[in-house]
């Protein structure tokens, strides 16, 4: 009598390749002193796996400064990080008013559209929080548009 043998798996002759996520990046100018920058990760099926960053950058004395950005790093949920002020580079993450449901592709499109539609509001808020006025010589003048 022959002993029963359990099913054995064939060893794969060609093991699966380790594929790292592809990062895509692009930016476009809203105006001469304001730009929108975004980057995202694609999975092996070329679908958006993560919104890495969608940011609004402003030019101050020939240097670009990010004043607000979105990412979906924490638990895949999109959230906004507004910069505190010109002197305080820390940010205050919030999900207030941010789209919460949808694919990463939809969240990316929403974040881009939000900055396109509200960039002036974000910039005015940054200027106000920075207490920028024409009398303050410590802060360079910031073009509104």
Regions found by a protein language model. Give the residues of each.
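Acidic, low-complexity intrinsically disordered segments
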Residues: 91-140
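Intrinsically disordered, low-complexity regions
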Residues: 2, 20, 46, 81-84, ...
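Intrinsically disordered, low-complexity terminal tails and linkers in eukaryotic proteins, enriched
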Residues: 142-145
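Intrinsically disordered, low-complexity segments enriched in small/polar residues
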Residues: 4, 24-25, 74, 86-90, ...
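Mature extracytoplasmic or otherwise solvent-exposed domains
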Residues: 35, 39-41, 55-56, 60, ...
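A short, structured beta-strand/loop element
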Residues: 48, 52-93
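A short, terminal or domain-edge coil/loop segment
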Residues: 2-6, 19-20, 77-83, 121-132
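Negatively charged, low-complexity tracts enriched in Asp/Glu with abundant Ser/Thr
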Residues: 1-61
